[in-house]
Amino acid sequence: MFLLMVPLFSYLAAASLRVLSPNPASCDSPELGYQCNSETTHTWGQYSPFFSVPSEISPSVPEGCRLTFAQVLSRHGARFPTPGKAAAISAVLTKIKTSATWYAPDFEFIKDYNYVLGVDHLTAFGEQEMVNSGIKFYQRYASLIRDYTDPESLPFIRASGQERVIASAENFTTGFYSALLADKNPPPSSLPLPRQEMVIISESPTANNTMHHGLCRAFEDSTTGDAAQATFIAANFPPITARLNAQGFKGVTLSDTDVLSLMDLCPFDTVAYPPSSSLTTSSSPSGGSKLSPFCSLFTAQDFTVYDYLQSLGKFYGYGPGNSLAATQGVGYVNELLARLTVSPVVDNTTTNSTLDGNEDTFPLSRNRTVFADFSHDNDMMGILTALRIFEGVDAEKMMDNTTIPREYGETGDDPANLKEREGLFKVGWVVPFAARVYFEKMICDGDGSGEMVQSEEEQDKELVRILVNDRVVKLNGCEADELGRCKLDKFVESMEFARRGGDWDKCFA
């Protein structure tokens, strides 16, 4: 089965919501994402919780402009480890507990630590991330919700078919509609709201799904990301491993991969719990989650090493460092172009023509202007690569697989360092847990009135803009203006690689 359509929310009221209102004292807010202990939590690569990335170009809608279209492509929220990673974590903990004859004071907690994390599913932390994401999406794009009693005015939702992705879409929708209801305060006579459905697209190995890779055999068999990481681990992890073996235990000798598993526990053990819970401590006066004790075993420089390792894996496995990565994102880009231009999807790669040719499962109407899609980090990397977002990354200088470039460890999240980001790739800026990419169309005029597009002829005035985790990215190949935007027709032309199907023929050569 390629498709399921499930009901979302036909009626939402505060009494029907689960956990789901943001705590003003929490580390995680709809506006800025996760901000506590940022020197550590923002250096976990793709395992970082979402945080708003400072932007050199203002993410606000420019004065004199009015939005005409908004689409979000979102990663699922924070999850438990995958089965393979969970097994590796459990193995190293067992190794330590069964062999260690002495623990240094900072390591003694391991003796009594019971590994009880789940596998693969969304955590409570991840649920709240997605609720916050839905709230923020409504607050940013409320102007496009012309009439909340009209189904076509509300977001059209699609999710790739894994449980955590579906749950993320549901929690996002809860946040969106709770914000809408709080804003509009509709009279009882207007309730229930129009019934909404979510399109769920199968992730089976033979399913065409633009939000889940799996069909391109040559890409699936590639090992470029693993190879880059293996080289980097061999060059950079031995000093960390030697320190832990010398100072942390007696009677046990950890390998570099054992140490990597212990480092993985820092983010996974932290995001296993809600942002505000019994873990709140006096050391965090503003409230929020205490870092896992496993984080204290490592230095800030250790986490720079860890963060760079994750960036290498994504860049060379699922991004520009893999020659077939962009091709995995071509189908989604062609769907995006169809929505932006209100025209049929033209694609022969990963799109499902049955779904994309049906108005119920892929609506193409000038009245439909708000969309939300939910996917995974690896798939988003391919899509962003196909969108030419990473063309400014200097791979030779910034993505060396043995040495961390100076700029990588010095830029951080400080807005004062924005200029130093040019040519730099950090995966935590791109696809953290609950990552979101906003695609916007807007029309602008000289007098600031921001009149709506009135006719097809006026479409040539529409501009396209892309924001990645609140950071405006300057578009490539389409004569972008100083605000990073391109005219719609120029943007479409710049997607020539996607429009011709990428290198799909090489998938089966």
Curated annotation (Swiss-Prot):
Q: Any recorded use in biotech or industry, and what is it?
A: Phytic acid is the major storage form of phosphorus in plant seeds and, thus, in seed-based animal feed. Phytases are therefore of considerable economic interest.
Disulfide connectivity for this sequence is C27-C36, C65-C444, C216-C507, C266-C295, C478-C486
| A cellular component term, taken from the record's GO annotations | extracellular region
Domain of life per record: Eukaryota
Keyword tRNA processing listed? The answer is: no
Q: Where in the cell is it found?
A: Secreted
Q: What is its EC number?
A: 3.1.3.-, 3.1.3.8
Q: Which reaction does it catalyse?
A: 1D-myo-inositol hexakisphosphate + H2O = 1D-myo-inositol 1,2,4,5,6-pentakisphosphate + phosphate; 1D-myo-inositol 1,2,4,5,6-pentakisphosphate + H2O = 1D-myo-inositol 1,2,5,6-tetrakisphosphate + phosphate; 1D-myo-inositol 1,2,5,6-tetrakisphosphate + H2O = 1D-myo-inositol 1,2,6-trisphosphate + phosphate; 1D-myo-inositol 1,2,6-trisphosphate + H2O = 1D-myo-inositol 1,2-bisphosphate + phosphate
Q: Which Gene3D superfamilies does the record match to this protein?
A: Phosphoglycerate mutase-like
Q: How is activity tied to temperature here?
A: Optimum temperature is 60 degrees Celsius.
Q: Which residues form the active site?
A: H76
Glyco sites are at N171, N208, N348, N352, N367, N401
Q: Where does 1D-myo-inositol hexakisphosphate bind?
A: Q46, Y47, R75, H76, R79, T82, R164, K314, H376, D377
| Entry's pH dependence statement | Optimum pH is 3.5 and 5.5.
Q: What class of enzyme is it?
A: hydrolase
Q: Report quaternary structure and partners.
A: Monomer.
Q: What does this protein do?
A: Catalyzes the phosphate monoester hydrolysis of phytic acid (myo-inositol hexakisphosphate), which results in the stepwise formation of myo-inositol pentakis-, tetrakis-, tris-, bis-, and monophosphates, as well as the liberation of inorganic phosphate. Myo-inositol 2-monophosphate is the end product. Is also able to dephosphorylate the classic acid phosphatase substrate p-nitrophenyl phosphate.
What's the protein called, per UniProt? Phytase A
Write the lineage as a comma-separated list: Eukaryota, Fungi, Dikarya, Ascomycota, Pezizomycotina
Protein's gene: pht-1
